[in-house]
Amino acid sequence: MSGTFRFPALRLAPALLVVALALVAACTAPNAIVPKTGGNVGDQAPEFQGIANWINSERLTMEELRGKVVLIDFWTYTCVNCIRTMPYLKRWHDLYADKGLVIVGVHSPEFEFEKLTPNVVDSAKTFGLAYPIAQDNDFATWKAYSNRAWPAKYLVDKDGVVRYKHFGEGSYRETENKIWELLIAAGADVRDILVSTVPDPKFLPEARSRDRALRLTRELYGGYERNNTRSGLYIAHGDYYAGAERVLEYTDPGDHQNHSLYLQGNWFNGYEELRHARKTESFEDYIALRFSATSVNAVVNPGEGQPFEVQVTIDGRPLRPDEAGPDISFEQGRSVFKVDEGRMYEVVALPAYGSHELRLSSNSDDFALFAFTFGAYEEGP
């Protein structure tokens, strides 16, 4: 998320301190019933399972973390919703790690290339994540918690019991208050720490329009597996659905509707990705869409190929500097982004919410589009 974050704050209300002290008593009550294991509030938190690798720490276990307050954050590094939560996670780590909070980022990958340890290590460095990260490549820990979303946060108390959970973005003040409360219950002195009073980022009301054409564009996937479902059908060409892993030549029909992708030229419909299926010289093959948003992001992976550039146009022209996302550069009057690793590229950042035509094209046959995501915030991806 771009921009400088400032966190106006004040001390936690005395009423919350009373609640925290009451929790201390509750947690130390004799003859307590041992809760069942699971991801629901009141359950004993499951042990980490099936972890392929640990980043930023040695192997951790929930048993070893008894006495600490643990925040389990399920994430994946190309997920825009996860990326939007990172400034808050980093702030909590900086403020509360010395007080007994342990954040564990459980990385459960959406795409195969996100399973590669070097990719996760690089993303942790790029985002400035210093807390422990567990690679949950087979979703074993995800399943143990019966988790169902990225991002998802589970707060576990000093006795290993799940006390709070939240799916998706937002509720940052509520989450921090719960962290504060559980640390007090664990015996930490955090009364000198100022809790943020900043409201959640403002989601623009235009994005909730009842008009489908104006409503925030849904997440759009390129791969056959996500397309070939009742909630999918992201590709607006019937031939695409005749079978996976096929190369077809597509013709753009020209009349574009919000929430769909349109193709021109030769494309391969892989299970996870839509890949350009030939080398070209004049950017004649493209992916087009009509979108409604303030920002557009594209998950692109070069595979094992050489780096390449993707040309971007909006409403039939290059992006202007005030419309360009952080990954856009300008070359000889063109707006492009250079793909040298598999990640989410921030392509469009408009000054105001609106509906526009977008086109992405590349001469490389390594150009593989996995997903588009869209934002409707005053700033950020």
Description of each model-found segment:
Residues 125-130, 135-178, 347-352:
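Thiol/disulfide oxidoreductase modules built on the thioredoxin-like
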Residues 2-16:
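Bacterial N-terminal signal peptides that target proteins for export
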Residues 47-70, 93-96:
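A short beta-strand-turn-helix
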Residues 60-83, 89, 102-104:
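Short active-site neighborhood of thiol/selenol oxidoreductases, capturing the structured segment around
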Residues 83-126, 135-141, 310, 377:
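Structural microenvironment flanking redox-active thiols in thiol-disulfide oxidoreductases
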Residues 50-53, 80, 84, 94-98, ...:
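Sec-exported extracytoplasmic/periplasmic mature domains
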Residues 17-53, 176-381:
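Non-globular targeting/processing and membrane-anchoring segments
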